[in-house]
Amino acid sequence: NFAALEKHGKSAVETFIADAKKKGISVHIWMQVFYTGGKWISATNGDGSYKYSFFNSKIKEAKEYANLKGVAGVHLDYLRFPGTAYKHANGVEAINYFTKSLCNAIHKINSKLIVSAAVMPETDSNKYYYGQDIPTLSKYLDVVIPMIYKGNYAQGTSWIKSTTQKFIDMSNGAEIWTGLQSYYSDDDVSKLPASELKSDSKAGIDGGAKGIILFRFGLFNLFHFNTL
């Protein structure tokens, strides 16, 4: 992300991408959208108009990432409101517009780049609380990653499969990659046993996911993905 570029420079980041590629690893740049510097930023103004200036600055940032040599994609995080979308006129429409504009800008640079976004796992209420209109966003994004973090929702492994299936049913073109919590919960960051993490991953695959994302690095017990 921008911190890596600021700290190490473009050349070092591109070298990292090239080295990772030699090991069979594709690098996607993580990009925060409506949350930065510890603060949430609304996608709309008080009168319901879009924050075009902010949108343009974020699209410019995304284009810089898209131009990195060898990069595989750009991942959008915090593409949402913090549970308050219903209080903002045109909030859903603003996020749809921003996402469409950003995806078009990135794909214009390189149509093969994967634009993904993390979304909340609450399916029916995503739009109302977070402004995440999955059927519409999935028309523009290449990949939608629902954060199906069972520990945070006091759910079991079966919830991972059923929620993945719901997102697949809602998607209008984007692949669904299941996002998993590799630790017990935000209140207990102890690592899940590798066997449990494997079972959770299998639940996502059984639900139809085309990929599995583990959150987060440094907080998971490894297992061999080829055994899924």
Predicted regions and their residues:
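Aromatic-lined carbohydrate-binding/catalytic grooves of carbohydrate-active enzymes
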Residues: 1-10
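Short, well-ordered coil/turn segments that N-cap beta-strands
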Residues: 21-27, 70-72, 111-113, 142, ...
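Aromatic-lined carbohydrate-recognition surfaces of secreted/lumenal glycan-active proteins
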Residues: 26-35, 75-79, 94-131, 174-185
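Active-site groove signature of glycoside hydrolases
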Residues: 54-90, 210-213
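Alpha-helical scaffolding within the catalytic cores
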Residues: 11-15, 121-136, 157-169, 197-200
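Active-site-adjacent "subsite" loops/lids of carbohydrate-active enzymes
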Residues: 13-21, 26-69, 198
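Substrate-binding cleft of secreted/luminal carbohydrate-active enzymes
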Residues: 141-142, 146-157, 163-167, 172-228
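Substrate-binding cleft/loops of secretory-pathway carbohydrate-active enzymes
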Residues: 115-153, 187-189
